[in-house]
Amino acid sequence: EGLKTEHELQAYLIRRMEHFLKSRGRKLLGWDEILEGGLPPDATVMSWRGERGGIEAARQGHDVVMTPGETYLDAYQSDPATQPEAIGGFLPLQRVYNYEPIPAALNADQAKHILGVQANLWTEYMPTTYQVEYMAYPRAVALAEVAWTPKDKRQFDDFHRRMQAHYLLLQRHAVNYYRPSTFLAVNAQPDYTRQVNLISFTSEQYQPEIRYTTDGSSPTAASNLYTGPFPVAGQTEIRAAIFKNGQIQGAPTAYTANYHKAI
C-alpha cells in the first residue's frame, strides 16, 4: 500500500473499516483520533480530547458527538476525601449543566453538524452497579437537559429547583444517587472602597438555611442567618453551617478572612 507513517496506516485502516461498515448499511463512528491521517467521507467523530477535534471535524463537514471532560461522569463530584475512589478530576453537577456542546468557534452551518453529547462512565474504579449509579446520578440528569434543551432556555437555578422532584423519583426507584453535600464554599471578594471583604457562601443544597458567626464560635440555630454577601474588616474568623429544623447538617465550615494593606 506504500504506507510511510503510522498516521497513514491508521487512515488506511479507518477507510477499510468504513467501506466494510457501509457495505452492511452501517456508518463509521470513531473517537477523534480518527482525524489523524484524514477522515473517510461519511465518518462521524466523537470529540473527547476537548473540543478541538469536534471543531475541526465540523468545519470539514463531518457530524460530531461532543464528549469532552465535562461529560466524564467517572470524575469526582465532590471533595475526594469524602468520596469513593475515582480516576481523578472534578466534575460537580453545575459544571455538567453549564456545558454548552455547540462551540462558539463554529458558524451556523458548521454548528448543524453537532449531533449532541454523550456521557462517559468508565468503571475501572467502580466494583459494583451500586457505585455506578452513584457516579451517574444526578449528573446524567443534568447532561440530558443540556442535550435536549436550547442554550437560551437553560438556567441552573431553575434546574436546581426542578431537580428536587427528580431526587424523589430516584429514591422511589431505589437509585443510589449522590446526595448533595452540606459543605459550604466560602468566597471573599475585596471591597477596596470600604476596605472590607464581602463574604458569600455557596452550597450544593437547594435554598439552604445557612447560619454563621464572625467570632470563631460554632454556629447554632440562633446565629446570624445568611441572606446575602456581608462585609467583614481586618482578620475575621468565620464559621458557617447549614441548618434544617433547628439541627446542624454536617460539620461547620471554617474560614479566616483577612483584609490588609497588601490587598
Could you tell me what each predicted segment is?
Residues L21, V45, A140, Y212, ...:
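Hydrophobic, well-ordered secondary-structure elements that form the walls
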Residues L29-E33, M46-W48, V65-T67, N120, ...:
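Generic beta-strand/beta-sheet core signal
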Residues K22-D32, V64-P68, P150-F156, Y178-R179, ...:
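Acidic/polar loop patches that form or flank catalytic/metal-binding clefts of enzymes
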Residues Q77-D79, Q83-V196, E204-P208:
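Substrate-binding clefts and catalytic carboxylate motifs of secreted carbohydrate-active enzymes
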Residues A57-G69, A75:
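Active-site rim recognition segments
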Residues R154-I263:
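Short, compositionally stereotyped local motifs that mark structural "simplifiers"
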Residues E1-H62:
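Active-site neighborhood of glycoside hydrolase catalytic domains
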